[in-house]
Regions:
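SF2 helicase/translocase NTPase motor core
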Residues: 19-214, 218
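Conserved pre-motif I regulatory segment
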Residues: 1-14, 184, 193, 197
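Pre-Walker A (Motif I) flank of P-loop NTPase domains
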Residues: 7-13, 39, 92, 223-224
Length: 224
């Protein structure tokens, strides 16, 4: 599994509970750094498991330099300072809770670009569905999703751009590991395939945020 992460790129570790996913991810991160494949990894884990993850990390690599978030780090008056620590520190890894991770925004420019792409895909999808004689429920569902994305784009374009915000791209992380990634589901995905069970026609905000950050990581690694 570790070799697959190192040489195979994006990897899903779908072992049973207790089969060693934590150690596999930790070893993958440290070996990646040793081999020069990355400089700083970020581990996105359930909020209540950050300390446990830190303990397991140091059990495997006692001399590792890791940064672990606490609740106080993401209080309004501390968040910018903590993000600056991530960006400027020479850490082997940063361990952060799911909800804290979601509070580090992607840059507005990247958000806007992704929204434009999604709106274009859905517009094409609506047209394709109509030409193929698709059912009205699917068309209406796609149109609702398109309106929602257009509203998000309009809100983003109207918002003030703050100079003092540290965006995800500025953290200096170049490898990401997500524990219990099933928390990020219900991401909208348009496909020309029909009647595929489990595909959502609506978009969950936190899943969209994760998708944007994964796309950024893929840019750094050439899609791997």
């Amino acid at each position: 599994a570790i070799a697959h992460v190192l040489y195979g790129g994006n990897t899903l570790l779908a072992h049973e509970v207790g089969a060693g996913k934590t150690f596999e991810m930790v070893a993958s991160a440290m070996e990646s750094k040793r081999l020069g494949l990355c400089q700083k990894s970020i581990f996105v884990v359930p909020n209540h498991l950050t300390e446990q993850w830190a303990s397991e990390f140091l059990r495997l690599y006692p001399s590792a330099n890791i940064l672990v978030t606490t609740k106080k780090d993401f209080e309004t008056h501390n968040r910018k300072k903590f993000c600056a620590r991530i960006a400027t520190g020479d850490y082997d890894a940063v361990i952060i809770g799911h909800s804290q991770f979601e509070r580090i925004p992607i840059s507005p420019e990247r958000q806007e670009r992704l929204l434009h792409q999604q709106i274009e895909e859905i517009t094409d999808g609506i047209q394709d569905t109509k030409l193929a004689g698709g059912n009205s429920f699917t068309i209406k569902s796609l149109e609702r999703t398109k309106k929602g994305l257009e509203a998000r784009l309009k809100k983003l374009q109207a918002s003030d751009r703050k100079d003092d915000v540290i965006y995800f791209e500025q953290l200096g992380v170049d490898r990401m590991f997500v524990d219990e990634s099933d928390n990020y589901k219900n991401l909208f995905l348009y496909t020309k395939m029909r009647n595929v069970a489990g595909l959502s026609t609506t978009d969950a905000q936190k899943s969209s945020d994760m998708f944007s950050k994964c796309r950024y990581m893929d840019e750094l690694t050439g899609g791997r």
